[in-house]
């Protein structure tokens, strides 16, 4: 596949059920042909492959030598539980702490609101997350990690695709193309959002229980992310942040230019989000 099709990476199914020694030997053999990106369908923080907690091995060490990234299944299921009212936004902090306790800052996981398994077997993001589908898309893209966009999400796909048969996607007029373009351009271009960068700071913002806010900052450039999981508008937290008050802010989705004081005076809409970045 590397020699003839020039593939640049592999997504390896239930990688943790294969002996890690195999992957550790396979990776340098592939890299000798061409540097590849290796993604493991596995999460060392959450049971994968249909295993129970008792059967699960969290010490597969797939990210030591063989793989660049694993799935972030623990966060995925946490977001589902949040939408169901079975978890609190503060539980995200516990997840991030567990991730950092296990891995150095250079390691990052893949986060998502849908993928081929989830869409077909568990339901679309609109079935599972309801009005939080887009706020949680913002969250999975801008928390530390690598975001995944599944087929049809930019077209607001709202049906379960057949798993083993051809099932064409109705692309419509790509209603969410602008949303995902702005989101991923920010992710790609902003220095504070780079994957596995130990120089990027993460600051959690205090606020009401239904608001999850954080700042990511590097060398004076910052991104503010605010997620409102409630049915009521919420005010922005007023605490001191890493943002230089002399710098103006740019609302990534509305295009507004604001002062820090103006930004703090705004609310986050019900089941909504706001993403601000410092102006250059």
Where are these regions (language model features)?
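Solvent-exposed beta-hairpin/edge-strand motifs
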Residues: 240-255
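Carbohydrate-binding surface patches
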Residues: 204-242
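An active-site-proximal structural segment forming one wall of the substrate-binding cleft
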Residues: 1-8
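Active-site-proximal helices and loops of the catalytic beta/alpha 8
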Residues: 3, 13-105, 109, 139, ...
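Short, solvent-exposed loop/turn segments at secondary-structure junctions
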Residues: 8, 16-19, 43-46, 115-119, ...
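Aromatic/acidic polysaccharide-binding cleft in carbohydrate-active enzymes
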Residues: 107-174
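C-terminal beta-strand-rich structural cap/linker in extracellular carbohydrate-active enzymes
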Residues: 260-280
């Amino acid at each position: 596949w590397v020699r003839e099709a020039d593939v640049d990476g592999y997504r390896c199914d239930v990688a943790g059920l294969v002996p890690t020694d195999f992957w550790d030997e396979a990776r340098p053999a592939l890299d000798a042909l061409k540097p590849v990106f290796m993604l493991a369908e596995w999460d060392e923080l959450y049971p994968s492959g249909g295993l129970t907690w008792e059967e699960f091995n969290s010490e597969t060490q797939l990210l030591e030598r063989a793989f660049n990234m694993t799935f972030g299944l623990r966060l995925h299921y946490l977001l589902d539980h949040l939408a169901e009212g079975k978890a609190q936004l503060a539980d995200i902090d516990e997840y991030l702490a567990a991730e950092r306790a296990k891995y150095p800052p250079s390691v990052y996981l893949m986060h998502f609101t849908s993928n081929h398994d989830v869409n077909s077997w568990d339901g679309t993001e609109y079935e599972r997350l309801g009005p939080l589908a887009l706020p949680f898309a913002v969250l999975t893209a801008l928390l530390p990690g690598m975001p995944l966009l599944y087929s049809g999400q930019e077209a607001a796909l709202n049906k379960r695709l057949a798993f083993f048969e051809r099932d064409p996607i109705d692309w419509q007029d790509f209603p969410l193309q602008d949303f995902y373009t702005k989101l991923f351009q920010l992710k790609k271009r902003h220095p504070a959002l780079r994957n596995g960068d130990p120089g990027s700071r993460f600051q959690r913002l205090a606020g009401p229980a239904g608001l999850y806010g954080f700042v990511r900052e590097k060398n004076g450039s910052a991104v503010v992310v605010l997620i409102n999981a409630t049915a009521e508008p919420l005010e922005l937290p007023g605490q001191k942040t890493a943002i230089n008050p002399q710098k103006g802010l740019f609302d990534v989705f509305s295009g507004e230019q604001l002062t820090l004081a103006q930004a703090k005076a705004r609310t986050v809409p019900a089941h909504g989000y706001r993403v601000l970045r410092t102006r250059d």
